[in-house]
Regions:
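Short amphipathic alpha-helical segments
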Residues: 34-55, 92, 186-211, 247
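Surface-exposed interaction/gating patches
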Residues: 130-215
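Short, well-ordered beta-strand segments in beta-rich or mixed alpha/beta enzyme
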Residues: 21, 66-80, 119, 170-174, ...
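Short, glycine- and small/hydrophobic-rich beta-strand elements in well-ordered beta-sheets
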Residues: 49-70, 98-112, 200-225, 242, ...
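An N-terminus-focused feature that recognizes amino-terminal "leader" regions
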Residues: 1-64
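Hydrophobic, ordered structural segments
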Residues: 26, 62-164, 234, 265-268
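Short loop/turn segments at strand-loop or loop-helix junctions that form parts
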Residues: 20-28, 171-177, 266
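Activation on folded, globular domain regions of eukaryotic proteins
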Residues: 19, 35-44, 244, 250, ...
């Protein structure tokens, strides 16, 4: 039994904690290590990554960051905040004291969408109002069954995602405006209006199915912004395209506030070490 499993746990009622970690490498400190010490340090990080990935219900993405904002990044998903914190400390020290200098971090949780269409809404708005189907009809019931299956899969991805090893990883935090010097206040807007705005946003997102995998994690009360957005893609063109197109949706144009964007490249560990000059 590992140290993490013996410790008390802090787990949300549903979903996982998500921790984004970004570091710069102190190459001056790294250069003070002998060749054998450097090899030992890289072996230590490699073994730690393997250990974390073998931990129950846990995923760890590793990537080289493409700008001087950072050199290396990690995205950790795990239910237990105590385990996440322990892994974070070990990752920070994995190459030796003071080699990895934290430059940015973000804590959030996977969560359901507040604006997901319910079974009742789908039946009334789509099956009856739009398609003219009658409750109890064979086509009506088949459509409801298909909707239930689709929403179960969607909710599973929101709460317990399986993230692929697609090469491009984009992360940015965001919040919704709440008035002040702005005309628009998301939190003063009626729910039905907010739902319609988010429905339009979702329509834009579906155009990128198979090109972009998006994970929205909530961070109200946990970190500086209200959500963390992680995008996985095969190239940066699709990242740029979806972010640009969504900026024209009213929900972003009127209410969106965004933090810095971080772009990383998921690579095999040997290539990752070469990419960050270790």
């Amino acid at each position: 039994m590992t140290q993490e499993s013996q410790a008390p746990s802090v787990r949300p009622e549903e979903g996982w904690h998500v921790l984004h970690l970004y570091y710069q490498i102190d190459h001056a400190q790294w250069s003070t290590l002998s060749r054998d010490e450097q090899l030992e340090a890289k072996t230590n990080l490699t073994e730690l990554i393997q250990e974390i990935r073998s931990f129950p219900e846990t995923q760890l993405l590793t990537f080289a960051v493409t700008t001087p904002k950072a050199d290396i990044g990690f995205m950790l998903l795990t239910p237990d905040l105590i385990a996440a914190t322990h892994f974070e400390k070990r990752l920070t020290l994995s190459l030796g004291a003071d080699v990895l200098a934290p430059t940015y971090s973000y804590l959030s949780q996977t969560e359901r969408s507040e604006y997901t269409t319910t079974r009742e809404q789908y039946a009334a708005e789509t099956l009856v109002a739009e398609k003219g189907l009658k409750e109890g009809a064979e086509e009506y019931e088949a459509a409801l069954t298909e909707f239930d299956e689709r929403m179960e899969k969607y909710t599973q991805h929101r709460l317990y995602p399986v993230l692929p090893a697609w090469p491009v990883v984009c992360f940015y935090p965001m919040s919704k405006r709440r008035g002040g010097s702005h005309e628009y206040n998301w939190y003063g807007t009626e729910y039905d209006d907010r739902r319609q705005l988010m429905k339009g946003h979702a329509t834009t997102g579906r155009k990128y199915s198979g090109k972009i995998l998006q994970l929205i994690s909530g961070s109200t009360g946990l970190d500086e912004h209200e959500w963390g957005v992680t995008l996985l893609a095969h190239d940066t063109y699709q990242i740029k395209a979806i972010v640009y197109e969504m900026r024209f949706d009213d929900v972003s144009a009127r209410y969106g506030e965004f933090g810095d964007f971080y772009i990383g490249l998921q690579l095999p560990l040997d290539e990752l070490f070469r990419r960050i000059c270790l």
